[in-house]
UniProtKB/Swiss-Prot annotation:
Cysteine pairings via disulfide bonds: none
Gene Ontology process terms (BP): intracellular protein transport; vesicle organization
Biased composition (Pro residues): 218-227
Domain notes: The PX domain mediates interaction with membranes enriched in phosphatidylinositol 3-phosphate.
PX domain mapped to chain residues: 16-132
Basic and acidic residues composition bias: residue spans: 168-177
InterPro entries the UniProt entry points to: PX_dom, PX_dom_sf, SNX10/11
Transmembrane segments: none
Chain spans, region Important for membrane trafficking: 135-139
Protein name (database record): Sorting nexin-11
Location in or out of the cell: Cell membrane; Endosome; Cytoplasm
Positions bound to a 1,2-diacyl-sn-glycero-3-phospho-(1D-myo-inositol-3-phosphate): 59, 85, 99
Organism per entry: Bos taurus (Bovine)
CDD domains, A to Z: PX_SNX10 (cd06898)
Length: 270
């Protein structure tokens, strides 16, 4: 009887999709092509996703492309709006924070639509670090790896660093957690994500992204290997979704420091 009860509970388990847009950073700070990007962390138990946990960085321009593609493929199904390009806010920091909140609201609405959720471009946008041309090549059959394989390859590329990160984890105080869902890549090493916030793990236990082998394949032929591992930044696990996210600039070696609001004027619209 207990066995059948457990089966019934599993069948009735509610699907949950959690998405967070956070940690805005100015990339290529000081150059003509500087821009702001955002970390997108996704954790789910839905069978619609190949990887149950993922972490990528995307810029506003890529969100604009994604919305156009979703609208093109969705037909009469409405696609949520993106935050506008208006700069009528009190400061540059406030503008970026408003945009971050708007981008998160956009993704939350998109992920509530069954039609939009079936678009393979959305999955590659959220669960791989492929560029826009690489995503287009993948869904159009002009690359050698399938959509699901591309997502799996990106997920598995974040499983390294086990030996290196054990030492760092052992020095954390009780209750502390690593400060990122995706570690910045180090030369010669692959990056490794941390367990989802709030989930207690043995600091010496190797954690890897959960992959659903029974997830329905996303219909699309293939793409080339990902050009680079995850570049998700260091975000504190206690950063709330509504809390203001400090803007950072990326310097040599993968470190980040707060950015003077006056330096953001040339990168807000990119």
């Amino acid at each position: 009887m207990g066995f059948w009860c457990r089966m019934l509970e599993n069948q009735e388990q509610e699907e949950v999709i959690t998405v967070r847009v956070q940690d805005p950073r100015v990339q290529n700070e000081g150059s003509w092509n500087s821009y702001v990007d955002y970390k997108i962390f996704l954790h789910t138990n839905s069978k619609a996703f190949t990887a149950k946990t993922s972490c990528v960085r995307r810029r506003y321009r890529e969100f604009v492309w994604l919305r156009k593609q979703l609208q093109r493929n969705a037909g009469l199904v409405p696609v949520p709006e993106l935050p506008g390009k208006s700069t009528f806010f009190g400061s540059s920091d406030e503008f970026i924070e408003k945009r971050r909140q708007g981008l998160q609201h956009f993704l939350e609405k998109v992920l509530q639509s069954v039609v939009l959720l079936s678009d393979s471009q959305l999955h590659l946008f959220l669960q791989s670090q492929l560029s826009v041309p690489e995503i287009e090549a993948c869904v159009q059959g002009r690359s050698p790896v399938s959509v699901s394989d591309a997502i799996l390859r990106y997920a598995m590329s974040n499983c390294g660093w086990a030996q290196e990160e054990r030492r760092g984890s052992s020095h954390l105080a009780e209750g502390d957690q690593p400060k990122s869902c995706c570690f910045l890549p180090r030369p010669g090493r692959r990056s490794s994500p941390s367990p989802p916030p709030g989930e207690e793990k043995d600091p010496f236990e190797v954690w890897a992204p959960v992959v659903d082998s029974e997830a329905p394949p996303l219909e699309s032929p293939t793409l080339p290997p990902t050009s680079s591992p995850s570049c998700c930044g260091f975000a504190r696990p206690d950063e709330g979704l509504s809390a203001s996210q400090p803007v950072r600039r990326v310097l040599g070696g993968g470190h980040a420091v707060p950015l003077d609001p006056g330096q953001l004027e040339t990168v807000l619209e990119k």
